[in-house]
Amino acid sequence: MEERTEGTEEGLRYILQPPRNQNVGLFLDAAPLRSWVRQNANNRRVLNLFAYTCGFSLAAIAGGAVQVVNNDMSRPALDWGKENHALNDHPPRQVAYLPHNLMKSWWKVRQFGPYSMVIIDPPTNQRGSFNAEKQYSTVLKQVAKLMEPDSLAAICLNSPFLDHQFLENQVARWMPKARFQQWLPNSPDFPEAEPERALKVGIYRL
């Protein structure tokens, strides 16, 4: 990767590069969720959906996860994530990378299950891959089949047009056994005058 540099968050090192489409390689507003993952991943098998450069995966391994399975349709993003793990000397055998479009098939993710933690952090609307309003239901239905009893789910929505109630309704309908635990607070580094337009992260127990 050209012109790359390194950044550090809570002792973990990340490869960064000048913004491309507003992305430097790490979504900074998701820092509270990375902290939560690290605090709750011990001895868990973690499924990281729409993993991008695997920031949540780094947090999970640092927090004692047994295994993390990273899924994203972008192979370059997952290769970047693999470099991030190597930068932190994480054991390669504990981390899997699946460059695959979930909207076409779930079998690659299913073969590594069941899981005891899942992070779902999809793009709001990415042409050719995912539309949150139309396809979040499919993700929740499939994820519900992959989880062990007493597992944890971090369910994210990063849309200025869809609110907390949308996410609550989706989970209630398509993942009915999920029990709401909390909304994670937004990062103080990214104050939002209209909270419904900011990143929304609901924590559930299945």
Task: Label every PLM stretch briefly.
Residues 1-27, 35:
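Non-catalytic substrate-recognition/targeting regions of SAM-dependent transferases
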Residues 73-119:
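S-adenosyl-L-methionine
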Residues 102-174:
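S-adenosylmethionine
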Residues 43-52:
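Conserved class I S-adenosyl-L-methionine
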Residues 53-66:
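Conserved SAM-binding loop of SAM-dependent methyltransferases across substrates and taxa
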